Amino acid sequence: MADHALNLDDFLSRFQLLRPQPSRHALNQRQAAVLVPIVRRPQPGLLLTQRSPLLRKHAGQVAFPGGAVDNTDATLIAAALREAQEEVAIPPEAVEVIGVLPPVDSVTGFQVTPVVGIIPPNLHYHASQDEVSAVFEMPLAEALRLGRYHPLDIHRRGNDHRVWLSWYQHYFVWGMTAGIIRELALQIGARP
């Protein structure tokens, strides 16, 4: 996808034109959701976080704001919005949810639903010190360029898995986060 000039209207049109394929919803898996925040600009951005190095799981990794569904969450979307508010102070009412991508199975046993939402450019992010060490924005056109992701095939717990790897500035984007970004790129019609 040679979309260095990808604008928000093009992104929205493509996303809404090509609806994600229905996917299985595993009732026996723990559920989680992440917000995939698209920053509303003429050349939109993709908001990402770097997890605190002090966390027990996925410490220091680049991620979307999100986490496990809890009993206060009415829906997966509500869980993603709550977690985004807790982790980086994005007010739920500031997010225009435009859809969801197919759920992804995590290595920690969760089924994670990516919730795609548009956020205003003038938000003041406040990273939760317990969970987030950095908040940064990547140009959406660059994030959705499939050629920037490189595959790595790994064998874990008796199964073969493909994970995707990429760098942006000094951030290493890989695993589930890179996979979700690639899925979003494919959803809007990018070709490998």
UniProtKB/Swiss-Prot annotation:
Cysteine disulfide links: none
Cofactor: Mn(2+); Mg(2+)
InterPro entries associated with the record: CoAse, NUDIX_hydrolase-like_dom_sf, NUDIX_hydrolase_dom, NUDIX_hydrolase_NudL_CS, Nudix_NudL
Alphabetical list of Pfam families matching this protein: NUDIX
Chain span(s) of sequence motif Nudix box: 67-89
Residues annotated as domain Nudix hydrolase: 29-160
Enzyme class: hydrolase
Protein name per UniProt: Uncharacterized Nudix hydrolase NudL
Species name: Klebsiella pneumoniae (strain 342)
